[in-house]
Amino acid sequence: FNDVGQSADFFLRTLEDDASNVALLRQAFLTQYYYGDIEQAAALGRQLEGLNVVVPLGGEPATALALRNADWPASIVLADRIAEDGQALAMAGVIRGWSLVAAGQGDAGISALLEAGRMSIDVDSGMPPFFRLHAALMAERLGLVNEALQRVTGLEADSLPSHVALDLAAFYARRQKWDIVDRLIDTQLSRQFNQTDVRAALEQGTRELPAIQQYIAAAVVALALSDNKNSGQSLAARLRFALFVDDDHHFARLLLAQQLSDYGQTDIALANLERIPDGGMFGQLARLAESAVVEEAGDSERSISLMKAVADRDPGNAYLFHRLGDTYRRNSMFRQSRNAYMASLALGRDTGGLHRSLGVSLERLGETQAAETHLLRAIEIDPGDAYALNYLGYWWADEGRKLDQAIAMIERAVSHRPSSGFFVDSLGWVHYKLGDPARAVGYLERATELEPSDPEITGHLGDVYWALGRREEAMFKWRLALTLSDDAEEQALLERRLRTGLTPCLLYTSDAADELRS
């Protein structure tokens, strides 16, 4: 998937020289679909059909073409072809249902949709809620308002995915039931959404019914997200399908951009995010995603600028100031991160994650008493917060304070995250600080197995080996740590270790500054 664009081009060019190669034809079809060239994929799909070759997703690009062109009779026929893929029966039913409604066969359309819903029933959770919603939307489209309202009665009280909640809110907005709309916005949407923008977009959307293509695109996305068996490539294909049918489906574009970013296609991801305008239902989510993508790409200045703009636009949203603080903290701007976290607290946010992150920033600023207060508050809110437990425990152990409490905290952190080399390192290091290198060595050896490229952990193991009299092994670990480190102070400390070893006065200490001065 990382090179799907190049793959699509490669298979298409190769096919020119070997047009009868069915294997190449299949790969060319799939990569064109995943890449988003629906028209080319549809043409290749017709070639495969002419050869009586069945391929997964085979009928979908041609169906997308028919839907975009509002060729409802063709869409109905092509939906039956999609159904030949046993994994796409529900998608076929949704497309067939809406196409029948568009063709004036409303009752048959609702029946086809609900039959698809019955095929999607989960033993634990029942029928996915968007089937009920789309049955109501079909009834609304047919002018059967009372039936539509009846079909979604009580649905707003269920736990709904945000995209389903927004489509339900849009339905109630068209019915002028603003109390339900506001309840959906308040209870079903995360704080990543700008609630004012969402409300304004819903008000604007009351002027006319969406096009049939918009309903189908929304249903295809909802169906793809509800299918836990969907591979990343299948999800990408369905998102491309939805965007081909409805180019303004901002939620599908947001999801596609996030997926592209996950696979390292930063420029294409950003190009998609930039097509989602500020405001509206998904503008704020797009800017948050954009900030994350550019930070991952190494542009911290732009990431911070985007985050500040989002927070300025939605100044009463405590979540945004928490996230802005995280962006500052990851860039070692601890004074700014502290201020952002304090703004989030002032707006009423009181989560363990916020107190932990604020505590870390305060500790890095030397405000130790306040830092401990917030780290302890994080643990009070979430006694299983392994990061807060490890951070506070390691801090105390590294400074030789409250060692019994420190080791108990780190043991709790390791019990929650036994595969974290950093937490296992902390546990070994505190035993070393307590003067028990024999007990520490097993933990530190395990930590280096879990995090073999971390210079600090590797250096810790070298210290323990030295304390145990295993001098050659200690030297080896310090040399390895030196090659792994890019920190000047750490490199100087390791070079000193390699020249003189650990003198008795430095055993079981960790004050690098004192060691470098000695």
Predicted regions and their residues:
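Structural marker of alpha-solenoid helical repeat scaffolds
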Residues: 17, 50-51, 85, 119-123, ...
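Start-of-helix register in tetratricopeptide repeats
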Residues: 23, 57, 91, 127-130, ...
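Canonical tetratricopeptide repeat
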Residues: 27, 61, 95, 131-134, ...
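Residue-level recognition of tetratricopeptide repeat
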Residues: 30, 64, 98, 134-137, ...
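Conserved small/polar residues in nucleotide/adenosyl-binding loops
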Residues: 508-516
